[in-house]
């Protein structure tokens, strides 16, 4: 039987596979200093193994604004939303001339094939994470990781009702973090801003109180389930000396 790990931090695709995640490494160190056991799951590397480097490379190099990775994972993150696939790919090819011309039909078919594999990948990843019997799972969200992270956390929350989910990273800054939390109820906690100093106490509090932490007890920039009932704080500036004159 595997040994339970209270906290799993997940580095979702699509992100660089040449180096470990500095951000998650810092969080793991902070959790260790707080007396909490955690592990980092490099799901970006699992995805490379799942689809192969020939397909992973172009996804890693695709500009985030093209939303190609979002499109690939959207069917799992938002199962009720099914856009016209060929219309999206037409626009993508139009905006990305490198994919146009000879072989475009094959590239189109390959992207559709990759999209059909995402459900299996998310299930496989969820199996590997749940085997660790975590109490909470946190996903990073930088650049193209946002929708893949939403897809995984949704699947995990469906399969383990007691599991507490967290999200943080550059895509969760300010109003982006608040909007993510408000619109996606399967994400229990969103951390907006640097988490190094607060992650230890926050995770201890979550382990003790689960989803029932009152807004007043949460650190600045952290949104929890109780915010959905009590309301979200108004935007504020902590350091008035930094306000432009």
Regions found by a protein language model. Give the residues of each.
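Glycine-rich beta-alpha loop elements in corrinoid/cobalamin-binding modules
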Residues: 6, 14-17, 21-47, 103, ...
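Polynucleotide-recognition surfaces of large bacterial nucleic-acid defense/processing enzymes
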Residues: 236-238
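Pyridoxal 5′-phosphate
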Residues: 245
């Amino acid at each position: 039987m595997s040994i339970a790990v209270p906290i799993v931090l997940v580095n979702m695709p699509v992100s660089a596979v040449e180096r470990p995640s500095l951000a998650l490494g810092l969080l793991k160190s902070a959790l260790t200093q707080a007396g909490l056991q955690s592990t980092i799951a490099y799901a970006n590397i699992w995805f490379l193994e799942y689809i192969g480097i020939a397909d992973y490379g172009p996804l890693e190099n695709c500009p985030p604004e093209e939303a190609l990775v979002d499109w690939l994972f959207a069917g799992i993150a938002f199962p009720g939303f099914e856009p016209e696939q060929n219309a999206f790919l037409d626009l993508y090819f139009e905006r990305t001339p490198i994919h146009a011309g000879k072989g475009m039909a094959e590239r189109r078919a390959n992207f559709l094939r990759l999209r059909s594999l995402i459900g299996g990948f998310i299930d496989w990843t969820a199996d590997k994470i749940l085997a660790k019997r975590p109490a909470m799972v946190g996903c990073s969200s930088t650049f193209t990781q946002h929708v893949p992270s939403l897809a995984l956390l949704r699947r995990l929350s469906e399969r383990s009702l007691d599991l507490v989910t967290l999200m943080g990273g550059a895509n969760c800054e300010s109003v982006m973090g608040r909007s993510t939390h408000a619109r996606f109820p399967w994400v229990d906690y969103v951390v907006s801003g640097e988490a190094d100093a607060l992650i230890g106490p926050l995770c201890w509090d979550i382990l003790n109180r689960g989803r029932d932490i009152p807004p007043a007890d949460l650190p600045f920039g952290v949104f929890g389930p109780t915010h959905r009932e009590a309301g979200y704080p108004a935007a504020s500036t902590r350091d008035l000396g930094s306000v432009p004159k």
